[in-house]
Amino acid sequence: MDWIKKIALVSALAGVVCVVASCRISMGLAPISSIDCSKVKTITIAEFPNRAEYVYAPMTTEFNQKLKDMFIQQTRLQLVNANGDLEIDGEITGYNQYNEAVAADGFSSKVKLTMTVNVRYVNNTNHEEDFEQQFSAFQTYDSSLLLTDVQDDLISKMIKDITEQIFNSTVANW
């Protein structure tokens, strides 16, 4: 009788091993895009100059790099210097701060930092999708802090937001 239990146990374990070995769960981020890969293979992303009244030089470099990285990492498009199937260009048009919330003492307690980018998008395989549009993002910070102390972190967050908006409006069609 013991040998029947042993055979049943070994058979059950072998069955579990076979089921586990035949199942594979794959997790990861798949490229997110709704472009027709049979027609669209390349993208040209021009350098966006900073034409805002207030210029913070590191913002321009970070924005240009993050925008290119977004398309390289999340699509199969090849980045080319000119004449891409898709073309994106534009300029940073706004970088401003505004007093937002007034405290009981009559002074501002929060400051709103905004960034605005004008984008021109051309789809050379389907010109019905071409557009020119402004994208903006903002972050707030406590007015007791100096802008120079929080600027880099806030700019990174705004750039992430704006590059996602641009990506979604161009190739993700959201």
Residue ranges and their predicted role:
Residues 1-12:
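Bacterial N-terminal signal peptides that target proteins for export
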Residues 2-3, 19-65, 69, 76, ...:
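A structural "domain/chain start" motif
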Residues 10-20:
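Bacterial N-terminal signal peptides
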Residues 31, 73-78, 85-130, 138-149, ...:
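Surface-exposed short loop/turn segments
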Residues 55, 59, 109, 150, ...:
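Conserved acidic
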Residues 151-174:
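Compositionally biased, intrinsically disordered linkers/stalks adjacent to structured regions
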